[in-house]
Amino acid sequence: MTKKDKGPKFANVTTKSGEVVKVFEDLNDFETFIKNETEDEEFDHVHCHLKYYPPFVLHESHEDPEKIKDSANSHSKKFVRHLHQHIEKHLLKDIKERIKLPDLKFKDKAKEESFEHIVWKYNDVTQYHGKDFEIHITVECHNDSAIVDVDYLTKPLTAAVEA
């Protein structure tokens, strides 16, 4: 008897504007969802959110969130450096693989810093199966926790209508 393959676990959250956003707490579930949406041809209109401890933080705490150091936050240069490396070398790379666009470059990058948080924004316009769409990824870390927020949004590009 084989074990049933369960889909990614997430919660649906409705925003003030009425949009339903899928919220994930596991990186693998998040990546699986993105992969499934791409395979289902719904890749150009996805909005989901991920709240997770980065793998390097869990590794340092021996996979126990209770043992994560209080210093693992946006005020720690080491944490920020490792998080940025994780984003650039793993998170973005894995997303590109899941949506089957390994050549995606995220040319439009930005970083915003304040006392409360650091935000990295990655944007690009791309095409898949003949459909043009925008992809926006926002990664945020805070001054009071090692939890990282990732917002993933894709929107179809509509051709400008000439009057």
Swiss-Prot record:
The keyword Membrane applies. GO terms for biological process: energy reserve metabolic process. Disulfide bonds: none annotated. This is Respiratory growth induced protein 1. It comes from the Eukaryota. Belongs to the RGI1 family. Keywords: Cell membrane, Membrane. Its main location: membrane. Involved in the control of energetic metabolism and significantly contribute to cell fitness, especially under respiratory growth conditions. GO terms for cellular component: plasma membrane. Gene3D superfamilies: Respiratory growth induced protein 1 (3.40.1000.40). It is found in: Cell membrane. It is a peripheral membrane protein. The keyword Membrane applies.
